[in-house]
């Protein structure tokens, strides 16, 4: 159905549908096809439109009505201006503001406002109205036209004064709305450039004659054919009441809308399941239809949809709409759609409804049941308790507020609404069985008491808390392996006699897959709290110490009762923090049960001790800042080091005595001999992190080590046996941490040499200073930007092989013979792969082998005459192998340097 057809049959028109038969339609068609009939018809139209004929027609009508005792006056409206609006937001409407001398003049009088006392003018503006008539707009669509006629003086005043013009417009709109029961859109008024809409048609004013004769008052035989006579008071005009309050003109119009509930046919709702009809009354979607007749498109329209509302705004001039609509159900605003029908100018919005799950429905029914039971106002004293006691308990319980924590960020609560006030008695449901968590931990840090409840698979939406001043009640549910929920309850309460000033400020609950973490934030520090009360409810509370892990199984209850912690004697826990030694000393001592007053005095003493310790810490910090530049050991540390030296000297003496024995096992190795020579009772000194040489590397003990972890590029490197032996030595309590005083350095400080305060001082000085020396030589490695490191390494390896082969070809027979004699003279068989170039690096160390042995022997002798090297041939062999390996490494590094120089030259 088109818009014109729908408006034609609207109730606004008041016209009945044209009922014409087929026979009548054929007769009209045949008559119009006759030329003579058409000519007569056009003559009739011209006769009606002729002004002279119209005057004659009005004169005859006036004479006829006078014979009936009715005075008739014709009003001919003169053009003024036009106001365009709409009726009920459906149909266009034009109001012609016209003028006629027949209408009385507007008059005014001075009046006083009764509320403000101000003087002003009270206007009386007469007007005449014509019945609405149908017409067509510029688009040939049907519209309504109303005529409101004023005196010409009123229009003249309106042209000169804008306020009076607005008063004329408001008076015309009020008259049309009250006379014809329509609703005009005052927010979207338009003023087209027209003087008059349509053809001007005269209207008639009828009133009874004042001097009517008896014949005129008699009923006419054709009375039923004439218009109805006016009433006796028809000559009195209708007076519209003056508006006492100025109603502001609305800036936006509210469009007409409708909300439809859309429901699909679901065959699952017709089954015999218990939850089949839970969602029957809830629609699948909401369809919102908004009528926007002044909009041809939604380009200038803004639409915002939320879960519970729809907001529409149009700021287009002449089509200002604003609508804020609350929806009856929660909808999914992300999945909705909107469509604008340009033919009917209707906006259709489809929004799917968010349906609650079966679990939420059951929780909702439980909430209604609980609220109905608690708000019924009827209480039965079945236990014989007095009403006064119940009122006192109710006042205490009124302070408890349930805090619902939703970890899924949903608006639907589980068991209680957020604003419900719940007492501790009604916090746990009577129809459920609650268990205490099997194991939980408790710890305190500053003002936070943390509980870890070891319960897996906790449902986050089942966590509920009841917070009071000195207690907290927690309940939650865990889903087991058989998908059956297990309900838990945990009540923690502070003892009444301990720390009465402590109160719970706020809480934090975190439910994870493996446990539940409960944090209580107190109003002040609670580190001195010795114990707390815990249980499933207030009737089954037990006292637990603060620090520890507790199991609540039945098998462990007997062991807990026999434990000293569960005895009646309380425990005294003292913690001392030493900043100098970076240690925390914890002492736990049982003490006899004392009175609450004695415990309070004990807590005060502990607080005083803590304050004294804090003051002492501040003094120690200041002293450390003053002595920051002096890096020295204390006297006690030096005494311990001296004692360690004496003990090591005794160990070396015992080792020498055992080595002088004639009988030694054949398979005895130096490591086994050292293990045998170790004394049974070792020196009990505090174990420290240390780096030390292996005891088998005695020949290199005379060389001072640096503090760098990386070895020098050209210096000797320890072999695999050295590193292995050093790892074995670390297992001892004080392995090789102190050397003889005459060796010039101490290995307990990482091989850094120490300066002596005096030449004659044999022992360690009180201030053992550490010195660091650096080498001025800078080693560098150059890499090309356009090549990778691995590729360059392979390239250098090829160059190195070519260089070695070239050196072998250039060597004379005499040089190669000398190298062979050197190898055979040392009693070693030269390997097949060793070249002459390699031999020049082995020649010097092997020839000086005997001299190095004598030198090492002299250096290894202590000032007291003790030989610390054990004079083993095995050590000499190991030394020779290490020297060969170091020489090879040195040769390889020198070749790398040569290659780098060649690359730079290239």
Curated annotation (Swiss-Prot):
Ranges of biased composition (kind: Polar residues): 837-850
Organism encoding this protein: Drosophila virilis
HAMAP family hit by this protein: Kintoun
An annotated GO cellular component: cytoplasm
Source domain of life: Eukaryota
Modified residues (Phosphoserine): 376, 812
GO BP term, pick one: cilium-dependent cell motility
Protein name, entry field: Protein kintoun
Subunit note: Interacts with Pp1alpha-96A, Pp1-87B, Pp1-13C and flw.
Gene behind the chain: Nop17l
Pfam families named in the record: PIH1 (PF08190), PIH1_CS (PF18201)
Described purpose of this protein according to its UniProt entry: Required for cytoplasmic pre-assembly of axonemal dyneins, thereby playing a central role in motility in cilia and flagella. Involved in pre-assembly of dynein arm complexes in the cytoplasm before intraflagellar transport loads them for the ciliary compartment.
Record field: compositional bias (Acidic residues): 894-906
Basic and acidic residues composition bias: residue spans: 639-655, 851-865, 875-887
